Amino acid sequence: MKFLAVLVLLGVSIFLVSAQNPTTAAPADTYPATGPADDEAPDAETTAAATTATTAAPTTATTAASTTARKDIPVLPKWVGDLPNGRVCP
């Protein structure tokens, strides 16, 4: 009987946690609250700067993360860590 009670409590807690954390994120609001009028064109400098900033940031973060990542797994034996590198087993 205790086992059944534990299973019910576990199921209820999982349900409550999943209800609080949605699996899909809501789309972000990408439009400014106040923008240029319909007949007014956006400034070329502002548009170019925003485009450069958004394209440069992800590339830099990816490069930094890939160069600092460790290649081996310290917890496992050395021969297990060598398997992804293409080395032959002992």
UniProtKB/Swiss-Prot annotation:
Residues 25-68 are annotated as: Disordered. Expressed in mammary, salivary glands and prostate. Also detected in lung. Mainly expressed in cancer cell lines of breast origin. Highly expressed in lymph node-positive compared with node-negative tumors. Detected in all lymph node containing metastatic cells. GO terms for cellular component: extracellular region; Golgi lumen; plasma membrane. Keywords: Glycoprotein, Membrane, Repeat, Secreted, Signal. Its main location: secreted. Residues 46-69 are annotated as: 3 X 8 AA tandem repeat of T-T-A-A-[APS]-T-T-A. Residues 1-20 form the signal peptide. Residues 25-36, 44-68 have a biased composition (Low complexity). Sequence repeats lie at residues 46-53, 54-61, 62-69. It is found in: Secreted; Membrane. O-glycosylated. Glycans are attached at residues 23-24, 30, 34, 46-47, 51-52, 54-55, 59-60, 62-63, 66-68. It comes from the Eukaryota. May play a role as marker for the diagnosis of metastatic breast cancer. This is Mucin-like protein 1.
